[in-house]
Amino acid sequence: MVVKVGIAKLGNIASGVMAELLLDERADREDMQTFMATSGTKLQPEDIDRVVSTMKAWEPDFCIVVSPNGVLPGPVGARDELLKAGIPCVVITDDITTKKEGWEALKASSFGYIIMKADAMIGARREFLDPVEMADFNGNLVKVLALTGAFRKLQTELDKVIDQVKEGKKGADLVLPKVVMTSDKAVDGEFSNPYALAKARAAYEIAQAVAGVNVKGCFMTKEWEKYIPIVASAHEMMRQAAALGDEAREIEKAGNGIIRKPHKKDGTIVSKITLISKPE
């Protein structure tokens, strides 16, 4: 059986850059296929409608709906429409746990969710953010999510859903993830050296704090002379978070202790630790 996994990418967060790649890192899995439909950079109704229509036509076994601020009308409407079409959905979004009404509604719904608390908002001020700065910020953020363990936890949760489909479950019978990706959850089981774990945890906490700084710079400060250094400082925080993630990984390398968990062609996850060894 080949499981069809849809990815509806609405706008952009760093988790969306890697969503389907984490499930098939060498593009050689034979048990599943992915298809992504994207609204591009915006969340306009017509763009979201195009994504939903395309995804319905492909008829995936389940759909991952990735977006910033997953309680906005656009992402909410998209997953509601997909659910009406009989397509189970897993929501991947940034930290919406402070948005009480929308967050409570998501928790009470039948949707799965993975809340990536460190997938922070960018410093989107024209005086500061150009294409190079945007790419640099997202590159640092992807590194933080990868090297702290957050991406592995996300991938593992999605693989659990794929495995259920392979077992014959479908629709409402699927048990979907309900995960808030905290720093403790991200680093759990990822490191043998406690200093590496501490650095990775610090990286995640710093990245998580970036969102609040960028909210201040983008929405709460009106004078350009003041908001430019605020958003610039947030991007410097993300750069340091990425550096801490690198340091954590280098410590694990020095002890020959990097955990690797590749997929086999049939989707089975195997693992190894020492570099010169075969995954089992």
Swiss-Prot record:
InterPro entries: MTD, MTD_sf
Source species of the chain: Methanosphaerula palustris (strain ATCC BAA-1556 / DSM 19958 / E1-9c)
A GO BP annotation: one-carbon metabolic process
The family this protein is said to belong to: Belongs to the MTD family.
Reactions listed under catalytic activity: 5,10-methylenetetrahydromethanopterin + oxidized coenzyme F420-(gamma-L-Glu)(n) + 2 H(+) = 5,10-methenyl-5,6,7,8-tetrahydromethanopterin + reduced coenzyme F420-(gamma-L-Glu)(n)
GO MF assignments: ferredoxin hydrogenase activity; methylenetetrahydromethanopterin dehydrogenase activity
Pfam families: MTD
Lineage summary: Archaea, Methanobacteriati, Methanobacteriota, Stenosarchaea group, Methanomicrobia
Name by which UniProt lists this protein: F420-dependent methylenetetrahydromethanopterin dehydrogenase
Gene, per the UniProt record: mtd
Keywords, sorted A to Z: Methanogenesis, One-carbon metabolism, Oxidoreductase
Keyword field contains Transit peptide: no
